C-alpha cells in the first residue's frame, strides 16, 4: 500500500495542479466575461474599484486640508517669539564669508529716505548757488570783454572826453559802468558770441 500511496501522491499533485490551473482559467474567463458584460453597464454605473479610488482621493484631500491647518498652526505659533529668544538668536554667530559679510552690511544699513531727500535738496541748492556764482562770474567776464571790445572801437572818442574841461576821474568810472551795464541788453549766449568772436 505504501507504494500505491507514494505513486498516487504524484498523480494527485499533478491532478491538483491541473485543477488549480482550470480554476484560474475559469476565474479569468469569468472575469473577462463579467468585464465584457460590465462594460455596457459601466457607462451607467461606476465599478467598485472606481468608487474605492474616488473614496481614497476624497480621503487624501481631507488629510491634505488637515495638514494645511496643522501647518498654519505651527507657523503662526513659531512667529511669536519673546524678546529673550530674539536676543539669543541674534547672539548666534553664523559662518561669514566675504560675500555674505558684504551682503549683511548692505542689509544692515537702514536708509532714511527723508534724510536722503533733504541731502538731495541741499545738494541741489548748492549746485544752484554754484551755477549762479559761475554764471555771475561768466557774466562779469563777458561784460568786461564787451567793454574791452567797445574801447577798441571807440577808445579815441573816450580819450577826447577825458581831455574835456568838465571830465573828472569819477566820470570815467561812471562811463565804464554805463558801458558795462550796456552788455545787459544781450542775453548770455549773444554776449558770449560777440566777445569770443572778436
Swiss-Prot record:
Subunit: Associates with nucleolar pre-ribosomal particles.
The membrane spanning regions, by residue number, are none
* Biased composition annotated in UniProt, kind: Basic residues: 14-27
Its function, per the record, reads:
Required for efficient biogenesis of the 60S ribosomal subunit.
Return the InterPro entries for the record.
Ribosome_Assembly_3 (IPR051898), Rsa3_C (IPR028217)
| The organism of origin for this protein | Eremothecium gossypii (strain ATCC 10895 / CBS 109.51 / FGSC 9923 / NRRL Y-1056)
Basic and acidic residues: which segments have biased composition?
70-84
Which Pfam families does the UniProt record give? Rsa3 (PF14615)
Q: One GO cellular component from the entry?
A: nucleolus
Where in this chain does the entry annotate a coiled-coil region? none
Name the major location. Answer: nucleus
The protein's name: Ribosome assembly protein 3
Which GO annotations describe the biological process of this protein?
ribosomal large subunit assembly
Amino acid at each position: 500500500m505504501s507504494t500505491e500511496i507514494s505513486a498516487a501522491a504524484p498523480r494527485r499533485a499533478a491532478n491538483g495542479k491541473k485543477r488549480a490551473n482550470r480554476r484560474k482559467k475559469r476565474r479569468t474567463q469569468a472575469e473577462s466575461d463579467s468585464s465584457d458584460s460590465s462594460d455596457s453597464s459601466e457607462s451607467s454605473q461606476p465599478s467598485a474599484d472606481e468608487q474605492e479610488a474616488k473614496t481614497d482621493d476624497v480621503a487624501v484631500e481631507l488629510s491634505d486640508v488637515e495638514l494645511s491647518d496643522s501647518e498654519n498652526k505651527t507657523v503662526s505659533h513659531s512667529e511669536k517669539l519673546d524678546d529673550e529668544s530674539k536676543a539669543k538668536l541674534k547672539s548666534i554667530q553664523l559662518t561669514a564669508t566675504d560675500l555674505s559679510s558684504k551682503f549683511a552690511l548692505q542689509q544692515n544699513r537702514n536708509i532714511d529716505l527723508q534724510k536722503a531727500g533733504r541731502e538731495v535738496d541741499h545738494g541741489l541748492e548748492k549746485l544752484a548757488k554754484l551755477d549762479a556764482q559761475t554764471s555771475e562770474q561768466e557774466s562779469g567776464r563777458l561784460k568786461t570783454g564787451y567793454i574791452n571790445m567797445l574801447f577798441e572801437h571807440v577808445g579815441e572818442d573816450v580819450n577826447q572826453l577825458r581831455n574835456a574841461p568838465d571830465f573828472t576821474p569819477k566820470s570815467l568810472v561812471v562811463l565804464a559802468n554805463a558801458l558795462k551795464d550796456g552788455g545787459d541788453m544781450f542775453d548770455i549766449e549773444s554776449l558770449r558770441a560777440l566777445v569770443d568772436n572778436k
